[in-house]
């Protein structure tokens, strides 16, 4: 079973993802209670996830792409094998969606999804990481 840590602010969205991941029987998903980088690192030390799924928004400095990438740099120092996946709303934030795509192209992250992704595709893609 793959351990996956989820740092997504939207409660409805994260609950839907948790439900779908649990249904497959392939994942042990854990919702991280905070978006603060220090708290994410502390939680990840406890969970030791194989995948970290995070949302990216311009709402808070911690959830911007810059904030998330900075946190991932620290995370990968401790957990180099942990895959990092970002989720963003391509309709509300088209420029941010482009930045996330460029982060993947630059190999700063292992994967990304847009908010319009179906849960089936999300689960299948995470299984393949």
Task: Show the residue positions of the predicted features.
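C-terminal output helix
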Residues: 114-126
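Extreme N-terminal starter segment of soluble prokaryotic enzymes
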Residues: 1-4
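Conserved phosphotransfer microenvironments
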Residues: 52-75, 91
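Alpha4 helix (beta4-alpha4-beta5 surface) of REC/receiver domains from two-component response regulators
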Residues: 64-66, 70, 83-111, 120
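His-Asp phosphorelay/catalytic-motif detector in bacterial-type signaling
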Residues: 76-83
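Conserved sequence signature across two-component system core domains
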Residues: 7-8, 52
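Two-component/phosphorelay signaling modules centered on CheY-like receiver
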Residues: 11-37
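Acidic, metal-coordinating helix/loop segments flanking the phosphotransfer/catalytic sites
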Residues: 34-51, 61
